[in-house]
Structures are given as C-alpha cells and as structure tokens.
C-alpha cells in the first residue's frame, strides 16, 4: 500500500507499482554555472571516504557549478596556489584541503576556498569528526562553499526521508541529502507511507498499517520513541506539519468521505477543516501557515485547491489536465510542485503561483511525491524510469537532474528535511 494507491482507492483511480535500484548520476547542463575545481584532499587516500569527490558531487547536483578536472595531485589548505594555472584550466574557484587521522581515531578535516580570478583566499573551516561523520564533514564543506559563492544557504548537510520496500519488508529510511548513509528509522512487515518531517527536524510523522488500518504516528528520531497521533474511526492518513510545528493536517474518514482535519501536535480531538461531499486529501501548508493546499475531486477530477486555515471557501489552483495531485509549496511560497497525469504518465510540474504559469520538470517515467529542499533551489521526488525506481532531484528549470544513491527495492514518497538546527 502506497500513498498514491491510497489516494487512488479513495478517488477510484488506478495505482502504480515500482521496482528497481538507483545510483548516483547527474545529467543535464545548466546556464551560468560557475566553473570550480576541487583538488584531492591531502591524506584522503588513507580514509574510507573520498571527501573531494563527495564535495564536488554535492556542488554539481545543485546545478550552480561546473566541475573542472583538478588532476590527481593533492593540495591542502596551506598549499601555495598558482592561480594563473587554475585560470588556464578554466576554474574560477578552487577548493583545497586535508584530512588527518588523530590518535583517538577521529579525523581532522580542513579545507579552503580560493577565488582563482581575483587570486584571493575566500576562507575555510575545520572539523574534527569520527569516521562515521566524514561524509557529513564533506557535506558541511559543500554548504560553506555554496553559500560563499551564491549568497544562499546550502542544503547538502540536510536529510531526506523516504519509504522503501524489499519483498514483504517496509523501511522508513533517513539518509543524507545525496541518498547515502541511509539509516532505518522503522522496519515493519506492514506498509508505511507518507513520511513528513517536523519543522525542527527532530521527528517524522508517518502512516503505518500495522493495526490493519492506516493510523498516524509521530516518531522521535534521536530516541526511536514514537507516539500514536491519530487512530480515529476509518482511515487516518496524509499527515502534514504546520510551519510552527504545533499543528498537523490529516486526512480522516471518521465522518464519511475523506476530509481534511487539523489536530494539535500533542494529540487530542481534531477539527474538521473541509466540509465537502467529495474526497479531500493530501494537504500541505503554505510557508506562512495561513493557507492549506489540498487535492479534491469536488469538480469531477482530482485537482489542487487552497483555502484559509481558519476555514472558508476553497479556491481551485490547477486547471490544465484532468489529474493533478501531490502539491508541495516552495519555502518562499511563490511556487508549487505537483504531479500531473499526461498521456498515462505521471510527471512532475512546477507552477508559479503568482502568474499560474506551469513548467514541466520531467518528460517521462512515473513521478510521485515532490518535496522542496529547504533553500527552495531543488526538488526531490520518486520516479520510475525504464522499469527502475529512482530517487531523483531536479533544479527548478528541470535542466539538471540527479539520480541519488540509496537502498534497492521499491522507493517511494521522499520528503526533504529542514535545515539542521545546530551547526
């Protein structure tokens, strides 16, 4: 059972199956990419992680950078830089660094960013980490470099959650933003669907079928403890957090058809928000917390609507096509990613909410469950392409796509977590 199949069952529509594995792969060419070289870190050959490669892959996935071959010679953060040589190679920026194993088994990771055009030191950082956090150190370095060169916060040290199924086993995976280092937050022989990050990044809400019906839990990641949030009569599904973390929207059938309700994050009696005779589901909040976007078939086919959280009339948002689902709002509230059905395929699209203009971000496969990166510059989604499951990211123009690393089996319903609360 997946979120799409649950929605399809409610709306009387066919569901899709997905099987495969996925690998790291970046495709496409973007405009105005900054050419950057990342030299092999001195000492990284003696570590279990190729730090420079992880860092460069992060920058490439963002769509903002073009990789320049740094050759095989290692340069550390104290190396004397021949800027003319790097300019001749076409690199406007250069990253150098080192990694040293300490006596206690931890690693000292250092890096420095250089402006090859101006011949200037742009600063750097140092981290002391256990071997298990070497990839995180590379992601943090990529965050620093991304922010220095773009003026925007990087998302490489954030996390994603998604659902995987291998045989009869379901897992709720939490992974790095590149899909690596996946850890199982929950394993179950019964379906798990609809993972949703709390705004503070400490918990995940999700739907479990272990009670032989869909119920909603909130799972604290650090302790592994979880609490039952919604087990009302009928179906309990599609949790979505309000931006302040105090309230969640849910889809409940306690009063008949699937409708949107609001519930305190601590539990209690839910308040019904939608009041239609149709099927209303898949709610998400606007970033300011004032609006709810949701899917409804009240017009005859599944379309996306919005309404005030305080209640009132619903306004239709999507008009093109007869099947539009899975709304996800950008952090600035200006754009909405969603899935549309075109010629039997489910494809990712992006709408400018100001103008209503729609951009197709994928041209094939069976896409589902878009979720924005916390800086709003990338979208993660699940896709089935060529008979294989893939966890994908795309830039907002659709030009740069990356197939992320991760676990095999069926891959579904990714949700991109918030910025880490600690540095």
Map each language-model feature to its residues:
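Short loop/turn segments that connect beta-strands within beta-propeller blades
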Residues: 117, 176-180, 220-224, 264-268, ...
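Residue-level detector of Asp-centered blade-edge/turn motifs that repeat once per structural unit
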Residues: 199-200, 243-244, 287-288, 331-332, ...
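A flexible loop/linker signature enriched in serine peptidases of the S9 family
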Residues: 153, 164-171, 187-190, 207-216, ...
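Short beta-strand->alpha-helix linker/helix-N-cap micro-motif
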Residues: 25-85, 95, 99-100
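N-terminal secretory signal peptides and thylakoid transit peptides that target proteins
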Residues: 1-12
